[in-house]
Design a protein with these regions (language model features):
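Basic, amphipathic alpha-helical hairpins
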Residues: 145-156, 171-180, 195-209, 228, ...
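N-terminal positioning helix adjacent to the helix-turn-helix/winged-helix DNA-binding module
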Residues: 135-138, 142, 163, 185-196, ...
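A short, N-terminal "cap"/entry segment at the start of jelly-roll beta-barrel domains
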Residues: 1-34, 40-41, 123-130
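Amphipathic alpha-helical segments enriched in hydrophobic/aromatic residues interleaved with Lys/Arg
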Residues: 2-11, 110-166, 170-171, 196-198
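N-terminal regulatory/effector-sensing and dimerization cores
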Residues: 22-120
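Hydrophobic/aromatic-rich alpha-helical bundle segments in the mid-to-C-terminal region
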Residues: 22, 42-43, 89, 151-159, ...
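Basic/polar phosphate-binding segments, predominantly the helix-turn-helix DNA-binding elements
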Residues: 166, 170-175, 183, 201-243, ...
Length: 280
């Protein structure tokens, strides 16, 4: 049994929330708790940059031909926001976990302090922006301290942020620490793609072109396309389309917009084109 599961069940019980699934902020900035009481089939999902830690149940992620299993044995680190497909598997107990936002300033500070010791300088840069990291040893201990701090408001303020600092530090030192390290290396293709992704998520309503994004990334269109697909598992156009469709789905489900309103809200010039692509 996961050593995190009892703490997550305790947190779930403290919410007094009857919903079968949900997400809620915790007393630690940038840390949210999520739960799902039932299995869910493979479906599209948009993940922002962060760490996804599952202590009970399991998720299976699918991205560009790759498959990620994250559960009590491994967490998922996302150096860039990615739209991929996700499946939720539960046994007798609900899926429980936390999400930790990644603060760029925190990552930059750690890299500035420990760059030489990390051993990443001069090595080949990372390709994928999403990787699993084993939940064991010091990383598991730091996560346990974070969850324990949520029992008390003062602990959440004093101990929680320090535990988050250590979690990010431990991930940076892990087998896939480059996913975070390369975000701070501004001249790499990976960092350029990360900046392009920020632009796409900020301006997804606009008529963005690949040539424009490639120019801003100081790459040719073909080089940008290759680098983008290596990091996200999608071509730039596929990524932008999926992002718009997922944003539209959220607008339909949670904001009460109609189909035509949702289409124009996310940048489609034609509601009929949006309807065709949404049905696919």
């Amino acid at each position: 049994m996961s050593t995190l599961a009892p703490l997550l069940r305790e947190l779930r019980a403290s919410l007094h929330d009857d919903r079968t699934s949900g997400v809620t902020e915790t007393g630690v900035p940038g840390v949210s708790f999520f739960w799902i009481d039932h299995a869910l089939p493979r479906s599209p999902l948009l993940y922002d940059t962060g760490l996804v830690i599952v202590g009970q149940g399991r998720k299976i992620g699918y991205l560009g031909g790759r498959q990620f299993r994250y559960d009590a044995e491994s967490c998922l680190v996302l150096g860039v926001p990615v739209p991929f497909e996700c499946e939720v598997q539960v046994d007798d107990e609900p899926l429980l976990g936390i999400r930790v936002d990644l603060d760029p300033a925190r990552i930059h500070a750690l890299v500035a302090k420990f760059a030489a010791q990390l051993g990443f300088e001069g090595a080949e840069t990372t390709r994928s922006g999403v990787e699993p990291v084993a939940m064991r040893g010091a990383l598991l201990d730091a996560t346990r301290r974070l969850l324990e701090s949520l029992r008390d408001p003062m602990d959440s303020q004093a101990v929680g942020p320090a535990a988050v600092d250590e979690i990010v530090y431990r991930v940076l030192r892990s087998e896939h620490g480059r996913v975070l390290y390369d975000l701070t290396q501004h001249r790499t293709h990976y960092a350029s793609v990360a900046r392009a992704l920020e632009r796409m998520h900020r301006d997804y309503r606009k008529a963005l072109t690949i040539d424009e994004l490639a120019h801003e990334s100081a790459m040719s269109a073909s080089s940008f396309h290759r680098a983008f697909k290596a990091v996200t598992g999608e071509s730039p156009l596929q990524y932008l389309k999926k992002t718009r469709l997922l944003k539209a789905k959220a607008a339909l489900l949670f904001e009460g917009l109609g189909v035509e309103e949702a289409a124009y809200e996310v940048g489609y010039a034609s509601a009929s084109q949006f309807s065709r692509e949404f049905k696919r």
